[in-house]
């Protein structure tokens, strides 16, 4: 049975999240958690939290055995961009783009 977990409006760019997501795509859940535990990136903690939520959903909703779970699908979409202006010299300004993203993880046995 497929179980989905989503984390939306993450305050990190999709590009940074995809670096971590690509390392665990298609792996068993236990192996993916080990990889995320030793990955030294902020986005690894966010992906780990969402993966643990997917595991809990599978265990609670579908009574799945967590030892057999595998990541079937994992992807990151870009979310809305918060735009800010930073004043610069001589009356100019720069745009600051605060990017967000949406993470979706699908696990199955």
Swiss-Prot record:
One Pfam family assigned to this protein is Ribosomal_L22
CC terms in the record's Gene Ontology section: cytosolic large ribosomal subunit
Under Gene Ontology molecular function, one entry of this record is: rRNA binding
User: Any one Gene Ontology biological process term?
Assistant: translation
| UniProt keyword annotation of Ribosomal protein present | yes
**InterPro entries the record matches:** Ribosomal_uL22, Ribosomal_uL22_bac/chlpt-type, Ribosomal_uL22_bac/org-type, Ribosomal_uL22_CS, Ribosomal_uL22_sf
Keyword annotations for this protein, in alphabetical order, are:
Ribonucleoprotein, Ribosomal protein, RNA-binding, rRNA-binding
Report if keyword Translocase is assigned. no
Name the PROSITE patterns for this protein: RIBOSOMAL_L22
| Coiled coil (UniProt feature) | none
Superkingdom of the source species? Bacteria
The record ties this protein, via Gene3D superfamilies, to: Ribosomal protein L22/L17
Which PANTHER family does its entry note?
A: CHLOROPLAST 50S RIBOSOMAL PROTEIN L22-RELATED, LARGE RIBOSOMAL SUBUNIT PROTEIN UL22M
Family the UniProt entry places it in: Belongs to the universal ribosomal protein uL22 family.
Q: What does this protein do?
A: This protein binds specifically to 23S rRNA; its binding is stimulated by other ribosomal proteins, e.g. L4, L17, and L20. It is important during the early stages of 50S assembly. It makes multiple contacts with different domains of the 23S rRNA in the assembled 50S subunit and ribosome.
Subunit relationships:
Part of the 50S ribosomal subunit.
Name recorded for this polypeptide:
Large ribosomal subunit protein uL22
Origin species, per record, is: Blochmanniella pennsylvanica (strain BPEN)
Question: Which gene produces this protein?
Answer: rplV
């Amino acid at each position: 049975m497929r179980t989905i977990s989503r984390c939306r409006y993450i305050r990190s760019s999709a590009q940074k999240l995809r670096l971590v997501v690509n390392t665990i795509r298609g792996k068993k859940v236990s192996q993916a958690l080990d990889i995320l535990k030793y990955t030294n990136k902020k986005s690894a903690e966010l992906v780990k939290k969402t993966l643990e939520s997917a595991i809990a959903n599978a265990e609670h909703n579908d009574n799945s055995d967590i030892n057999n779970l595998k990541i079937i699908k994992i992807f990151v979409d870009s979310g809305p961009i918060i735009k800010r202006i930073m004043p610069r010299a001589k009356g100019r300004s720069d745009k600051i783009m605060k990017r967000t993203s949406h993470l979706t993880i699908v696990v199955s046995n």
